[in-house]
Amino acid sequence: MNHETNYHALLIADTPLIDVRAPIEFQQGAMPGAINLPLMMDDERAAVGTCYKRQGADAALSLGHRLVCGDIRQQRLEAWKAAYQRFPNGYLCCARGGQRSHIVQRWLQETGIDCPLIEGGYKALRQTAIQATWQLVQKPILLIGGCTGSGKTQLVRQQPNGVDLEGLARHRGSSFGRTLKPQLSQASFENKLAVELLKINARQTLKRWVLEDEGRTIGANHLPECLRERMAQAPITVVEDPFALRLERLREEYFIRMHHDFIHAYGDEGGWQAYSEYLHHGLFAIRRRLGLQRFAELTNTLDMALADQLSNGSTDGHMAWLVPLLNEYYDPMYRYQLEKKAANIVFRGTWQEVANWLKAQ
């Protein structure tokens, strides 16, 4: 039986995974849709690992059973049973498909539940994800470029073969790019990207991928090197919308929607504080590139804009610091980067013209 094919099918189907690894392992990397219900917590796993090194496998196994027994064992068993009842098509998963998933499988069988496990565990799924990404990005790639506020992400999302890298990374790429959802670990981001590629590829006869023109990193996540190499050679279509239209997109995204999201998440007072800190942090992150004097001036303008927004709800004041930020920093930076790829540009136009051009391809 072809295990790689089975792994692909499991990932494409969003098969629920009951991941019994320790929390620290899960945080370092997990598959999309996995839930972490550990057999051993971090300290328990560390103790068993130390015992294994000093006294061998049998002693470590014995210690593990002593640590996870009685009420602790029963509580964890109830959690696994509840997870299986919620996800009857789920699979058990540990690091390598070894003792931990087999132990949990056996304990569940003793209660009348027969839950399958992932042969090879997370490591096998991880290797499948890495290999799938490498294989799939060999297909042609078309990049959508343009200055900040050009609506590139929206264009990508509209394409049936579009891959929203920023959505997968939970970050919009700029110093103001973070969202309310924390970014995933690097391995989890790569896994999520691989699954997205597999899903899109399975839905259609794919001629090429459509991606946003990104740098090496999106927030804390960096793009897999195999993808970066392919993107560096890819043709680019550039969105060139009027400056005023870009400002309105940025107003909606950063001053209206982010304000709403923070208030929704943390309430009026806490949300406003978080929103204010978010904007200040974005400006602070590029203070050295702006120069400390310019940074201080724009920070003062930001403070006045926030006071205005708080008092009357208007976001107009933010234009007084956003416009110079675009003119003096973001636009020159992107245009400089784009000049280095000038030979790859295949089309330029407004957002609608690019959308029409993409449909015609």
Curated annotation (Swiss-Prot):
Record keywords, A-Z: Selenium, Transferase
Positions of the Rhodanese domain: 11-134
A Pfam entry, by short name: Rhodanese
EC number from the UniProt entry: 2.9.1.3
Chemical reaction(s) catalysed: 5-methylaminomethyl-2-thiouridine(34) in tRNA + selenophosphate + (2E)-geranyl diphosphate + H2O + H(+) = 5-methylaminomethyl-2-selenouridine(34) in tRNA + (2E)-thiogeraniol + phosphate + diphosphate; 5-methylaminomethyl-2-thiouridine(34) in tRNA + (2E)-geranyl diphosphate = 5-methylaminomethyl-S-(2E)-geranyl-thiouridine(34) in tRNA + diphosphate; 5-methylaminomethyl-S-(2E)-geranyl-thiouridine(34) in tRNA + selenophosphate + H(+) = 5-methylaminomethyl-2-(Se-phospho)selenouridine(34) in tRNA + (2E)-thiogeraniol; 5-methylaminomethyl-2-(Se-phospho)selenouridine(34) in tRNA + H2O = 5-methylaminomethyl-2-selenouridine(34) in tRNA + phosphate
Active-site residues per Swiss-Prot or TrEMBL entry: 94 (s-selanylcysteine intermediate)
Single biological process term from Gene Ontology: tRNA wobble uridine modification
GO molecular function: transferase activity, transferring alkyl or aryl (other than methyl) groups; tRNA 2-selenouridine synthase activity
Presence of keyword Transferase: yes
Coiled coil: none
Claim: Oxidoreductase is one of the keywords in the record: no
Protein family: Belongs to the SelU family.
HAMAP family given in the database record: tRNA_sel_U_synth
Stated role: Involved in the post-transcriptional modification of the uridine at the wobble position (U34) of tRNA(Lys), tRNA(Glu) and tRNA(Gln). Catalyzes the conversion of 2-thiouridine (S2U-RNA) to 2-selenouridine (Se2U-RNA). Acts in a two-step process involving geranylation of 2-thiouridine (S2U) to S-geranyl-2-thiouridine (geS2U) and subsequent selenation of the latter derivative to 2-selenouridine (Se2U) in the tRNA chain.
Assembly notes: Monomer.
Protein name, as recorded: tRNA 2-selenouridine synthase
Originating organism: Salmonella arizonae (strain ATCC BAA-731 / CDC346-86 / RSK2980)
